[in-house]
Amino acid sequence: TNMSLKDFAFEIASSLEKVDSNTSRSLNELPHRLEEVIPGIINDSKSTNSASLLYAIKKLNFDGNLIICGDPRKEPKSYEVYGPQQVYIFGMHRNELMEKVKSRRSNIKTFSNLDLVLQDIKKADSKPNILFSPGNSSGKDFKNFEDRGNFFKDKVLEYFSDWKAHFFW
């Protein structure tokens, strides 16, 4: 089924917390919930657990570069990621995440920081196809998901703003 990003965001928000469809707060005000930074690059920093991460991959039928980070201590067991061609793990919790995240199709690469991840993607791909859906709490890397999402957005614009013009209608 084809679903708009706004409808998809509402569906995810509804599944994670009680959402009143008549609420005065617009879905556009939900920070970093499937936010398209530039075409081909989605910021889902609001994803703070494996269930929301796996749901986003499935709903978007995502097969590009997945970036995850954060503290996996709240995840009771390991989980398998299906779909993405490449999984990138970065940050202070990358070793713990490597023990939790499994992937049959994907190569998993780890880096100490987001800059190195984005440099690797830019070097390898002719066009960006990125889902930043951490799937964990921020842990030691960021203050919260909003801080994390803003940082990701700034870095994407730093590394891919020259590609932006190629993807607008």
Positions of predicted regions on the chain:
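ATP-dependent carboxylate-amine ligase
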Residues: 1-19, 25-169
